Design a protein with these regions (language model features):
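Small-residue-biased structural context
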Residues: 1-152
Length: 152
């Protein structure tokens, strides 16, 4: 269910060690993604247009950076990853136009979908890219220590 009102901090997406992938440039841009998504979840309606505009700028940079890495290093599964980036960016831009017309509900719906989408995208697609990039720069796989998570 999509909230019609801002969420409080305990309900919104928040950065934590569970999102670390071990390749610092990706981890840093992911933290910004999570922080902006959480801000949009907690924002009053009047603040959403400016936050979504800031998020759109972030998203363009974020995806362009990852796409460039995938292309320049010939990352094998780059096509599906880049297609997903393009689809998400297109959705955000479409919602930005609808929000400008006053449709706050669709913006809140988008933000909730982004909060649900990101963890899986990061775990599946971006973790593979992080391993790939780390192996290209360091010659191995990253070691990630996550505080407060149980071991399997």
């Amino acid at each position: 269910m999509t909230p019609t009102e801002p969420l409080d901090a305990s309900e919104s997406l928040q950065w934590g060690d569970q999102f670390l992938l071990g390749y610092t440039p990706i981890d840093e841009v992911h933290q910004e993604f999570v922080d902006l998504t959480g801000q949009m979840q907690r924002a009053a309606d009047a603040a959403l247009p400016a936050l979504l505009a800031e998020f759109t700028v972030h998203l363009k940079h974020h995806f362009e950076m990852e796409n460039e890495w995938m292309l320049s290093t010939e990352f094998p599964p780059r096509e599906c990853h880049m297609d997903e980036h393009a689809a998400v960016l297109q959705s955000v831009q479409e919602v930005q136009a609808l929000l400008a017309q006053g449709n706050v509900a669709i913006c809140r719906d988008l933000v909730e979908h982004l909060a649900q989408w990101f963890p899986q995208h990061a775990d599946q697609l971006d973790s593979a890219l992080a391993h790939w990039m780390f192996s290209r720069t360091m010659g191995g796989k990253p070691v990630v220590l996550r505080r407060g998570l149980s071991l399997r």
